[in-house]
Amino acid sequence: VTAGDSSIYAAPGEEFTRDQALMAVMLQSANEMSVAVAEEVSGSVKKFAELMNWRAKLFGCKNTHFNNPNGLPDENQHTTAHDMALIMKAAADNESFQTIASTASYTIPATNVSGGDRVLTNNFSMLANNNAAYYQYCTGGREGYTEASGSTLVCSAQKNGIPLIAVVLQGTSGTTATEAASLLNYGFDNFNMLSLGDNDFNMLSGGDVYVPVGTTADVLTTQDGEVQDGQYSRQYLFGGTAVGTSVMAATQEEDTSLVDTSVQNIDAARNYTENRNNLPYFIIGGVGILLLLLILLRIIKIAKS
């Protein structure tokens, strides 16, 4: 951490609670607190970066590598928009993260070193209703800037029950929120949720897919996984693109004649996945803090259980 990086100006030896550290990282993008959290959890920044990379792989990230906990410039650190979307999805699904992300302000009282309060204000422009970049459907996110990465932003939003994620990398300062809003508006205007609950028997979970407006269930094809413990997963494809899954109960009466496992559709799904992963690398920027928060929230949850 160097002069000019986002900080709450914590002093050496100053003591903070876990909640205070979380809020400092999320609301103020406090880089020194990110390093302190990494060292507290793993003993060193290097060890924590290994934990971050392991966790990123669990989320499905294939083209991301962390070398520090805050996303500041490092020649061995990179990501893609697709991978950042996967990390943001995990964050959006985490209730504790969403609570922190939606906090407008938080006060850290006097510590063993500081005699006064620190008032932390949420600096994410898309959530601040007094900011020109405010986006009413936004549910959380992060933005950051370094000279190396340019402006970066990841966010989640929900409108009419449809959740979306937008990622902007290597953006121009002051425009990334507008660009993210444009991406979200395009998604909300051109895609909707199609419920397949009435089209399948013995559906246990899932069955909601996101497809272009006007799409009907009869144009979707399906692929079924292997039966395990009396259940199997069914993947729905639109034009060879995977758009959703459901968990089905395996019964003797189940009609498998509707299952489309043609080589053409399998190859289309595989090619789609490969094309999405063959993406250019970008410098992570400050949005790497998201994964740090998810790891710490996971550790806190385990400690409380």
Model regions: which residues?
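Active-site-adjacent loops and short helices of periplasmic peptidoglycan-processing enzymes
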Residues: 1-82, 86-95
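Domain-terminus/edge residues, biased toward the C-terminal soluble/receptor-binding domains
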Residues: 61-62, 73-78, 82-305
